[in-house]
Structure formats: structure tokens, C-alpha cells
Amino acid sequence: MPDKKLLSQVRAIFFRSKEMIVVLSLFFASIVGAAAWQMTRAISTLCDDAALGALDIPLKFSLASFAVFSFLAFEMSYKLRRYKLDECMNTVAHAKRKIFLAQGVIFVVIILIFFAFFNIWSLLLFVKYRNFNCWHGKFIIQTVLNMLLSHFFVPCCAAAMGMSASLLFRRINGCLGLVLFVLLGSPLSNYLG
């Protein structure tokens, strides 16, 4: 586990970076906007499928979260190298691992905030659609597992992939690799071939 001083340095570099804060703020604002739009819409009383379709809207942000967190982690690792933090830590044993862990801790905290918001959004949707046939135990368990996969594990893997790409490749090659990976994982890949 990295020490508190290293964590505070990594956190300070992250919050000092205006472009990363702007991207993260815009991403969270789009999520809050989508949640507010969905919560203010009128409920269709036609069938249970309308409720089930509305309950899976939070899950549609998983690809966007993958892209955002992979590029944020890539830029964060690049900034740490640009500020020569890894070069200063070369005198310490296992310094690169400690920097990688410190950066990972910062991203896990951000991802946990992201994950908590999506869980609150899903809970509010379940309350909104309480009169529909969506309170089955199996459906709730499936929704929780999907939320865990889509909004915790996918962003964590994206952050780890972005940090690793920054360590392995130069800036342009790493960004192009991440763009290619995001495109291949998106629905656009169906139209590429």
C-alpha cells in the first residue's frame, strides 16, 4: 500500500489538472442530466415492458464509463511521468508499483462515487416503477450484478488498462490503442466489418 504522502501528491496532481476535472465533471453532469430526465418523465401504464426498459437505462452508460476512465487513467499516468514523480521515486524500492497503486486508489475512490450514484439512480427507478412487475428477487439480483459489472468492474479494468497503456506506450500510440479498443468494444464495431 502506498504511503499517505504519495497518495496526497497523486491526488494533488489529479485535482490540479483542469482538463481531467472538466472531463469528469461533464461526464457526471451528463449522468445526472439523464437521471433527472428519466425521473421526471411520465410513467407509461401500458405494460411491464416499459418499466423493464426504463430500468436498464443506467446500464447503457458502461461503454462511456469505460472510455472516460481509460483515457483519464492514461492521462493521469502520463502527467505523473511528465511531473517526473516516477523519476524521483527511483531511489525507493518498488517505486513504480507504489505510484501505480496510489493512482489506482485515487481511481477506485472516484469509481466508487460513480458506482454509488448509479445504485441510487437504480433504487429510485425501482421506487418509481414499484407498481410494475419488477420487484422479483431474481430480477433485483440480476440488476445488482449487472450494476456491479457495468459500473464497478468495467471502469476499474478501464483505469488499469489506461495506466498500463501509459507505462507501455508513448502518448500517441497509447491513445490510438485505447481508441481502437473502445471502438472494437462499442456497437460501431458491427458496422466496421
Segments from the language model and where they lie:
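Secretory targeting signals
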Residues: A29, A35-E75, L101-G174
